[in-house]
Regions:
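C-terminal ends and interior cores of transmembrane alpha-helices
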Residues: 50-67
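A membrane-interface helix-boundary motif in multi-pass transporters
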Residues: 127-149
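Short amphipathic helix-loop junctions that connect adjacent transmembrane helices
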Residues: 1-15
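Helix-to-loop junctions at the C-terminal end of transmembrane segments
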Residues: 27-44, 129-130
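Multi-pass alpha-helical transporter architecture, strongest
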Residues: 141-167
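Loop-to-transmembrane helix entry/capping segments in MFS-fold secondary transporters
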Residues: 10-11, 100-110
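Intracellular juxtamembrane helix-capping segments at the cytosolic ends
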Residues: 84-99
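Transmembrane alpha-helical cores of Major Facilitator Superfamily
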Residues: 15-23, 50, 77, 108-116
Length: 167
């Protein structure tokens, strides 16, 4: 809906949002895994959270400037990168918290909870944009700001994560 309202063609959407994003997700999932191994789960989560918020600001820029395939390509690459990285970081974090004896059940519950917020927000985003009088730029800025409480909470539990992460 966003891409169409901004003025991108179906061909642009398919090329950049679908095809390019697929490759970016594969490549950066591997890179995200390497970064989490090298720097730890806490840093991986923190960097992913900040990067995801920043990627939403690129969507706000698209909403302000109008259709530009080069900006769309950059935005899709950055968004795919941050999405892949954050998924890897979240999977590592959830796996870290699971007890081996109950790992399947615990992982399923925590994974479901980790996407519940995103699903609820995504399903109501149209109503939010309508209440903002179609201001997609403001919507994406608000979604970037909404990350701040999660990052503050993550920062407050960093010592616990590092303690559990250390063998």
């Amino acid at each position: 809906m966003f891409y169409k309202e901004i003025g991108f063609s179906n061909s642009d959407i398919a090329t950049y949002s679908k095809l390019l994003n697929w490759w970016v997700t594969i490549v950066f999932s591997l890179l995200g895994g390497l970064v989490n191994i090298r720097y730890g789960i806490y840093r991986g989560l923190m960097i992913a959270g900040v990067a995801m918020a920043a990627s939403n600001l690129l969507f706000a820029l698209i909403a302000q400037t109008g259709p530009s395939t080069s900006l769309l390509a950059i935005t899709v690459i950055v968004d795919g990168f941050t999405g892949a990285w954050s998924t890897v970081a979240m999977v590592a974090f959830i796996s870290l918290l699971c007890n081996r004896a109950f790992s399947a059940t615990q992982y399923a519950l925590m994974a479901s909870l980790s996407v519940a917020g995103r699903t609820l927000v995504a399903s109501s985003s149209g109503f939010v944009v309508d209440s903002l009088e179609g201001n997609w730029s403001l919507f994406f800025i608000l979604t970037a700001v909404m990350v701040i409480p999660s990052l503050c909470f993550l920062y407050s539990i960093r010592h616990h994560i590092k303690r559990v992460e250390s063998p």
